[in-house]
Amino acid sequence: MSRWIQRWFFSTNHKDIGTLYLIFGAFSGLLGASISLLMRIELSHPGNQVLIGNHQLYNVLVTAHGLLILFFMVIPTLMGGFGNWFVPLIIGAPDMAFPRLNNISFWLMPPSLILLLASAFVETGAGTGWTLYPPLSSVQAHSGGAVDLAIFSLHISGISSILGASNFIATIFNIRNPGQNLYRIPLFVWSVLVTAFIILLTFPVLAGAITILLTDRNFNTSFFDSSGGGDPVLFQHLFWFFGHPEVYILVLPAFGIISQVVSTFSRKPVFGYVGIIYALISIRILGSMVWAHHMFTIGMDVDTRAYFTAASLLIAVPTGIKVFSWIATMWKGSISLKTPMLFAIGFIILFTVGGLTGLVVANSGLDISLHDTYYVVAHFHYVLSIGALFGIFAGFYYWIGKICGKQYSETLGQIHFWITFIGVNLTFFPMHFLGLAGIPRRIPDYPDAYEGWNIVSTYGAKVSIIGTILFFYVVYLAFTNGLISEPNPWSLRRERLDSSSRTTEWLIASPPIYHTFNEIPVIKET
């Protein structure tokens, strides 16, 4: 067997598996972004543009876009890619706790992706949205195998995530550096740890919900079928008990990356380290107690709505602690506006905008009007499309030199930031106005009155795609004729222990040798 196949297909090395995850995430992200551009072109003007009036096909695109970005781009990139690459390096571990489990965690993802893509080509595809609500996902409304394939895809992806999460928990608790207690590990490791616990506790609930849906579709049960004594709202409760923590699974590792980046480029330790840790844990706990704010329109009684409104508004407190801690870290720091820092600042500004619209839709009275309008789309894309994505870009530009030993072009990186920043704002900010005007989501046509802001939004999507193409060009240039990266490219003074070197990965070579720590290094306070 060739050494290449041995290395990449049977790898047990956390760096190689991290690289595979990053490549997989980039591929899935391109697919998801292409689908979103197709949807925006369809919505650029009233009437039929590219989908010849096929509303089912439009909903298949919505479903594929959501699932691709959430399960196949963001989680594999942030947890699988950056998590695998840097958690062992930062905590001084020789590898992950279970290297072969790590391998199967990755190799479950491509079959899962294939099943999801296959579902779009079976009969009319799965036009349910990523939420898979019955009765739309029931056998009466989607009679073919498409929804079943999507369910199997989510099962396999969920198994992968659960295995990966248990691996991270075992690694961080058991093969951490002897000198690093839990209050000394960097915030990126903390964010991965908290995220792993969320995955471990919520993915099994999703698995249960979609398994029951599978039996409803194929084995004549009626858990979600009201004609047989079931309740479709039960699915919504089960799904959102997973689905709301899921959005924190997506954004918490990005929080960790932003904490590291802001600290490095402000030349200061992060402000309120312990406060940020407790904010992370609070978000994790509160995030599992607010799921029904996605369901204000199903006819809950007023006491239930009052509780879920109050609990949802309460999440703003730990989130605010994190945002103000990042701002305080930058306050009076010696700020260096390199590309990762630009993405971090962009993240803080735009995530705050998304958080503010979140405060609006958390109010049950208002949400009755705003539910399933473009206002909600604008809200969660500001948090996810801008939050998680900017976190990924910040992490990539921050660590690319460590991953491949080559540095990117700073000029092109900054141009990429500005194109992306302008593009995503042009895309999603007008959606607030459309939502307030009452345009519903998941519908490919609309009255003429809404055309103006839709044109602006589609223009923004095209700008964002140009930014994405530029990003891949930046990566191509870095790999082909990039500058050789030093062990710590962000150091002001050419010393090993500059103020920016607060984590272990900057003390080793770029790229690191295949087996970085043959024996666990000892870290001591000086």
Curated annotation (Swiss-Prot):
It comes from the Eukaryota. Gene3D superfamilies: Cytochrome c oxidase-like, subunit I domain. Pathway: Energy metabolism; oxidative phosphorylation. One of its GO terms (cellular component) is mitochondrial inner membrane. Ca(2+) binds at residues 42, 47, 444. Component of the cytochrome c oxidase (complex IV, CIV), a multisubunit enzyme composed of a catalytic core of 3 subunits and several supernumerary subunits. The complex exists as a monomer or a dimer and forms supercomplexes (SCs) in the inner mitochondrial membrane with ubiquinol-cytochrome c oxidoreductase (cytochrome b-c1 complex, complex III, CIII). Belongs to the heme-copper respiratory oxidase family. This is Cytochrome c oxidase subunit 1. The lineage of its organism: Eukaryota, Rhodophyta, Bangiophyceae, Cyanidiales, Cyanidiaceae.
